[in-house]
Swiss-Prot record:
GO terms for biological process: regulation of translation. It comes from the Eukaryota. It comes from Trypanosoma brucei brucei (strain 927/4 GUTat10.1). This is Post-transcriptional regulator MKT1L. Its main location: cytoplasm.
Length: 1220
């Protein structure tokens, strides 16, 4: 019997997420580490981390339900709210007192997950002397390559199953037809006329049957059905007219599996179109390119022609194409000159960023001056292997203007960063405003429009999971940090640095959150198919082309390394004259390796090209597999191409020319190379042709005769843990981030160096790591067998500051979320099935916690029988939101009478009876211990130990709900974000503590920092950054105008806000995934994929609102220009912030939101006693003083009255109307 205000049971306070895990080693399987410095080679860094799990005590798994105020998902910041005193083993390495913190053992990183290598036995290159042969008859040369062993997960083999094989229902639809991913007009079916996923059986990753987490066959998973273009499109367009007679498009050979002559047995999804590769062409290249130049900034856009494609990646420094392991891992590689400004005069000169000079030094590799730095594009261009032709050559004979556009698979990472470089030419300080400015989205739109004008329909394919690699590539060098500090110093002094300084200091990756936001924009706004590959996006693009989903391929030259004979890669399209620069793989192989080809076979040459590309890799997708040798690219090529090689194996060749002759480092180089070979050959891709699963190895797509028995058994060391196939579909559709997939398959999380690094950010990340470990634990709990606690012990945290590799301590117990009985709730009735995006968070928070029910244990359920609890999309979506907010502690789970709770809400929030949408229970005078410490090892701040505290008489979500209801829907998530930022102390009025570039563990002395930081201005302007404002030029021809304020502290603040946004977004993604995996929803995988665009917290923060308010607050009322009226002041501000349209309206929005947020914080401070606001977080009368200042500035600029405090907690004297 539950009594009012009490917990359901004594275990509901199990939100203790303090760091209590063991010392953790670097993850064994699969990590890729990108560059973060413009002139940086990959250097093997053997971190001597190996953990030996010692568990003196076996802790039984407990289901900890929520305490009435289970606010502890962030660990230390939240644990101090309603948690018992923690033992002294919270965060950090080597902290005494923890049974989980056993001393780490040490072993070379690259030996993690691998058996001892046996001596090489075969001759020739491609032979790593390994444990298995990674080549197959008829497909690859006889060159076995070692990729390591020791993994116990039999990829490609069928594990033991209960009750035999799955039910075997065909999987409908095609992977190219996810919701909103079609083109704007139907493009017809693919080659063959059959449904794309015909004859597919639900099964596991890489050919293994798909299993539920309890070991039974998972018969619920199916790929999305064909839905056409957009949300409400029909199930598929009628077949197009028969394709013209003759050879397939672009000269693809009949019988090659592409085109009418090939044995294709599947149709193109609505987003597909038949076609083949490109045609032949001139071997010359139209432009001269200078190499060996310094990192000069490109010339102005006025002299550049429009270009589409991935031009000359070789002209970039290795780290400029800075993908991360999350999306290619998640962070797009860079390349210049992808898009021009429209309406500019053409010029024959393409401005491509240049390679670093040989005088540049590379961290960790002082003796590497003779290492190869030439990029693959340069290498091929110098040999006349870049073909040039007109785009018309890529269209089929007889193609008319009314025929459907050709589908082009585009490397999304490469493309997006190329557009970022165009933005850099317009505004070299673009990143100070936002990592996703509107101008970048405008460039994306222009890119799509230009391609469509040329009758090309793009398919953006983003990178997925990566391969393990060199952790030292994460390090940001001291020189780069010093350059950043110098640029910031100039900006703070009012001086604009030159473009070369800015580019050298801030060669930043975009981030997976930006990439996924762009993918959602492509799908929702532009109708472009945008997907995330399971692993290497080039492999998925090849699969698309092989199976007729795409007609053409557009990507970097490194795509030639894939063993696909029918490959012609477009690297650039000049819009001004329709010329196309492309690479023909067959021609390249025959020209480079004439001694290793026959008239009909280039397999051996392809193997040599793969070795050459991996040894000299400059592309970020391969950088973690690059081995640095004391040879130039030409010298490497000469050894690989000669008919009489000096070395019997590639392993011997690498060992002989390694920069370091230490045995351990040379072994690491060999493993890196072999991992790269395996990653290129065995990346998993979605396929329409597999007999048993749509997710197969690339080699099986290229050679359908290969079976599971032909596949290696130790690929876990390259690709990671086995997970349900449905998770890869979720990643494919953009619902589940690659960051989360990396954590659950490859056991690590990564954080990149921010634009403005602060000690506060380091502290914040440490706090958020506890939440992230709990979030990951939620999905591991659903899929892991053995239990998830074993898998979470292996999680590692990779970051840019020392120590670069840290343990990601697991929570003692995982949060056990309740289910919800909502089928008859009023809140559900308010949701429109067709307009779920219009949901109200206030309505979600008004659901009484009495509707929650303890989850039924999986072990108690009969096999294959999962009760359906949520019977529609709106029920499922509401349950996802309820579970997410429950995870954050927004439901008290008390049994207080509804009338008592409602009366309390009306009294505290000043709400009439008709205004309330439901009841939010509150706890009554419970006891809790609030604690906080500081762990020196992991540098995590804990709040001061304050002892026992009384629970507040009013529960904080009541104030949040009331505030949301009083504001527009488009800012509702911002108030939730505000609450979470306050809870972890990111919102405060203290100046940021900037990191000392000479020592990333030390902050710059406050005496050396600018002290123009009025605490009221800091607090108000930071809050204003949570408002999203438009900021873009009204016309392309307008000159760029710098905004009047550059705030280093606002930039540093938004870095922390962005980290919080990512955590919250990952939370709702994981909760969505767990609802699907639990099997208690009637929704299909397609239905879940549609949630990706409407789940909250997907926005990327911007400083524009904060910059605008900061400018208003720090200047006198006349702006030193004798302005006497509000109209004059607004007009003056509009001139300063020209790119903010309708400035008066947006200033009203910013100031109104900031005041409402201050009222909310004031309510938290007064009536929820340190549940949200720490005692020393906002001291004195800072909140009241800031409100006073805001009111005064409101009088100076806005005509109507400011918003009042809807909570009726601010002094009544401030509620009087303001005279005009």
């Amino acid at each position: 019997m539950r009594k009012a205000g009490a917990n359901r049971n004594n275990e509901r306070q199990g939100r203790n997420l303090g760091q209590q895990g063991p010392q953790m080693s670097p993850p064994g399987p699969s990590m890729m580490y990108p560059h973060h410095h413009q002139h940086q080679h990959h250097h093997q860094h053997q971190h001597q981390h190996q953990h030996q799990h010692q568990h003196p005590h076996q802790h039984p798994h407990q289901h900890h339900h929520h305490h009435p105020h289970h606010n502890g998902v962030y660990g230390n910041a939240y644990d101090n709210i309603r948690q018992p005193q923690m033992p002294p083993h919270s965060f950090g390495q080597g902290v005494s007192g923890s049974p989980w913190n056993s001393p780490p053992q040490q072993t070379p990183m690259y030996n993690q997950g691998y058996n001892q290598m046996s001596p090489g036995t075969g001759g020739g290159y491609g032979d790593m002397g390994g444990m298995y042969r990674d080549v197959h008859g008829g497909q690859y040369p006889s060159s076995p390559s070692h990729m390591g062993g020791g993994a116990n997960i039999p990829y490609g083999r069928n594990p033991a199953m209960h009750n035999g094989l799955p039910a075997g229902a065909p999987l409908p639809g095609g992977y190219g037809a996810l919701p909103h991913q079609g083109a704007h007009t139907p493009m017809g079916f693919g080659r063959g006329g059959q449904p794309l996923m015909e004859h597919m059986q639900p099964s596991g990753m890489y050919g293994a049957p798909m299993m539920r987490h309890d070991g039974y066959p998972d018969t619920r998973v199916s790929p999305p059905a064909q839905v056409g273009y957009g949300a409400g499109a029909p199930v598929g367009p009628p077949p197009p007219p028969p394709m013209p007679a003759g050879p397939p498009y672009g000269g693809v050979l009949p019988g090659a599996g592409v085109g009418p002559g090939g044995p294709m047995n599947a149709s193109r999804p609505p987003a597909g179109i038949g076609g083949g590769g490109g045609g032949g062409g001139n071997a010359g290249y139209l432009e001269m390119r200078a190499r060996g130049m310094g990192p000069q900034m490109p010339a102005s856009n006025a002299s550049r022609p429009p270009r589409i494609g991935t031009p000359d990646p070789g002209m970039m420094p290795p780290n400029r194409m800075n993908q991360s392991p999350m999306m290619g891992q998640g962070l797009p590689p860079q390349v210049g000159n992808f898009m021009p400004l429209p309406g500019v005069s053409p010029s024959p000169h393409a401005m491509i960023p240049t390679t670093p000079s040989m005088g540049d030094t590379f961290p960790g590799d002082d003796a590497n001056m003779s290492g190869s730095t030439e990029a693959l594009y340069d290498f091929l261009h110098d040999r006349g292997l870049v073909s040039v032709d007109n785009i018309s050559k890529f269209f089929p004979e007889g193609y008319g203007k009314d025929d459907p556009a050709l589908k082009v698979a585009v490397d999304g990472n490469f493309c997006l960063t190329s557009l970022r470089d165009e933005l850099r030419k317009r505004d070299s300080l673009w990143f100070l405003h936002s990592t996703l400015p509107e101008e970048l989205l405008m460039l994306v739109q222009q890119h799509v429009e230009w391609m469509r004008n040329m009758k090309l329909e793009p398919i953006w394919v983003f990178n997925g999971l990566s391969v393990s690699g060199d952790v030292e590539t994460f390090l940001t060098t001291e020189a780069e940090l010093r350059a950043r500090d110098a640029v910031w110093s100039k900006l703070e002094d009012g001086e604009i640095p030159d473009e070369v300084e800015i580019q050298e200091a801030f060669d930043q990756p975009l981030g997976e959150d930006v990439q996924m936001a762009v993918a959602r924009y492509l799908k929702e706004e532009l109708g472009v198919m945008a997907v995330t590959a399971p692993f290497l996006n080039w492999a998925q693009m090849v699969a698309f082309h092989k199976e007729g989903i795409a007609d053409l391929l557009m990507g970097p030259p490194e795509m030639l390394l894939l063993p696909y004979d029918e490959m012609k890669v477009i690297v650039q399209i000049d819009v001004s004259n329709s010329s196309v620069n492309y690479l023909d793989r067959d021609r390249v192989l025959r020209a480079l390796f004439p001694n290793h080809v026959t008239e009909t076979n280039t397999r051996v040459a392809g193997d040599r090209l793969m070795d050459l590309g991996l040894i000299t890799a400059t592309h970020a997708a391969l950088s973690s597999a690059r081995v640095t040798l004391n040879l130039s690219m030409q010298e490497v090529y000469e050894e690989l191409s000669t008919p009489t090689p000096k070395f019997r194996s590639i392993k011997d060749f690498i060992n002989a020319h390694a920069c370091s002759q230490e045995t351990g480092k040379k072994a690491g180089l060999s493993i890196k190379h072999s991992k790269g070979r395996g990653y290129l050959r065995y990346s998993a891709v979605f396929s329409t042709k597999s007999r048993d699963t749509p997710l197969v190895y690339l080699v099986r797509v290229l050679d359908p005769d290969l079976t599971n028995a032909d596949m290696p058994t130790n690929l876990a060391g390259v690709l990671g843990h086995l997970v349900p196939l449905s998770l890869f579909y979720m990643q494919f559709s953009g619902l589940l981030s690659v960051r989360i997939m990396t954590a659950i398959t490859q056991s690590y999380l990564r954080d990149e160096c921010p634009v403005s690094d602060t000690k506060d950010y380091h502290t914040t990340l440490g706090l958020l790591m506890t939440m992230r470990s709990q979030v990951i634990g939620q999905i591991l709990k659903r899929i892991a067998h053995p239990p998830p606690i074993k898998r979470t012990e292996c999680l590692s945290w990779v970051r840019w500051f020392q120590p670069i590799l840290a343990p990601m301590d697991r929570p003692r117990d995982l949060i056990d979320l309740d289910e919800w009985e909502i089928s008859d709730s009023d809140q559900l009735k308010k949701l429109d099935e067709d307009c779920l995006a219009d949901y109200s968070i206030a309505s979600v928070l008004s659901v009484t916690a009495d509707a929650s029910r303890p989850a039924v244990e999986e072990s108690n359920r009969p096999a294959g029988r999962v009760p359906i609890r949520y019977n529609s999309k709106r029920e499922t979506f509401l349950a996802i939101l309820l579970k997410s907010f429950d995870f954050l502690g927004y439901f008290s789970h008390s049994t207080a009478p509804n009338d008592a709770v409602d009366g309390m809400e009306m009294e505290c929030c000043g709400m009439d009876g008709h205004d309330r949408g439901g009841s939010v229970p509150a706890a009554y005078h419970e006891k809790d211990l609030s604690s906080m410490k500081r762990s020196e090892a992991s540098d995590i701040n804990f709040m001061a130990d304050e002892g026992l505290k009384d629970y507040p008489s009013v529960y904080f979500p009541i104030y949040l709900r009331a505030t949301i209801k009083a504001n527009p829907l488009d800012v509702q998530a911002s108030f939730v974000l505000l609450t979470e930022l306050v809870r972890v102390r990111i919102i405060n009025s203290n100046p940021c503590r900037y990191i000392n570039p000479a020592n990333q563990q030390v902050e710059i002395s406050m005496d050396d920092q600018d002290t123009n930081s009025d605490s009221r201005v800091l607090l108000a302007s930071r809050i204003a950054c949570l408002v999203k404002l438009p900021y873009r030029r009204a016309s392309e021809n307008l000159p760029f105008v710098w905004a009047p304020v550059y705030s280093r502290h606002l930039c540093a603040f938004t870095v922390m806000v962005r980290a919080m946004c990512r955590c919250l977004r990952e939370l709702v993604e994981v909760i969505t995934s767990t609802v699907f995996l639990s099997g208690n929803s009637s929704c299909s995988l397609q239905d879940f994929a549609e949630f990706a665009s409407i789940l909250p917290f997907g926005d990327v923060p911007s400083t524009i609102g904060g910059l605008l308010l900061h400018y208003v607050l720090v200047f006198p009322s006349d702006y030193q220009a004798n302005l006497t009226s509000r109209e004059e002041r607004i007009e003056y501000l509009q001139g300063k912030f020209r790119d903010i349209p309708d400035l008066a309206d947006h200033l009203h929005l910013v100031m109104s939101f900031t005041l409402q947020a201050l009222y909310l914080i004031n309510a938290y401070m007064l009536n929820d006693k340190e549940t949200i606001v720490a005692k020393d977080q906002l001291t004195g009368t800072i909140v009241e003083d800031t409100i006073e200042m805001m009111w005064q500035k409101w009088r100076d600029h806005i005509d109507d009255n400011p918003p009042g405090d809807i909570h009726n907690l601010y002094p009544p004297r401030h509620q009087e109307p303001i005279p005009h």
